[in-house]
């Protein structure tokens, strides 16, 4: 049986560009397309309270394989292009979700 995973991503966005970056994600349907993927259980962005230039993302996938497939899809490639324009740093962490 595949182990579900939790992925957390923290983007440090160029000064004053956080809202524009998030709006581009929404306007391009990247968040909706990611949520619609088979194997996705959660894909939500958050504004952290400790930084005005960071944007956080929480993802839950049914398996590492499902998340890996996500990174090959066109909307992920759009996100990669947006990151090149808006993002200074990315911290990504992956956690296995234990069976209940």
What are the residue ranges of the model-derived segments?
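Short, well-ordered beta-strand segments in beta-rich or mixed alpha/beta enzyme
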Residues: 5-12, 42-71
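Residue-level signal for secondary-structure boundary sites
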Residues: 17-19, 65, 100
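Compositionally biased, intrinsically disordered low-complexity segments
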Residues: 28-29, 33, 63, 90, ...
């Amino acid at each position: 049986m595949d182990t579900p995973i939790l992925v957390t991503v923290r983007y440090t966005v160029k000064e004053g560009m956080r809202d524009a970056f998030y709006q581009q994600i929404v306007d391009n349907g990247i968040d909706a397309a990611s949520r619609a993927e088979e194997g996705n259980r959660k894909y939500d962005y958050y504004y952290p309270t400790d930084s005005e230039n960071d944007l956080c993302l929480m993802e839950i996938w049914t398996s590492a394989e499902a998340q890996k497939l996500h990174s090959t899809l066109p909307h992920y490639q759009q996100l990669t292009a947006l990151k090149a324009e808006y993002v200074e740093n990315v911290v990504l962490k992956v956690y296995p979700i234990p069976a209940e």
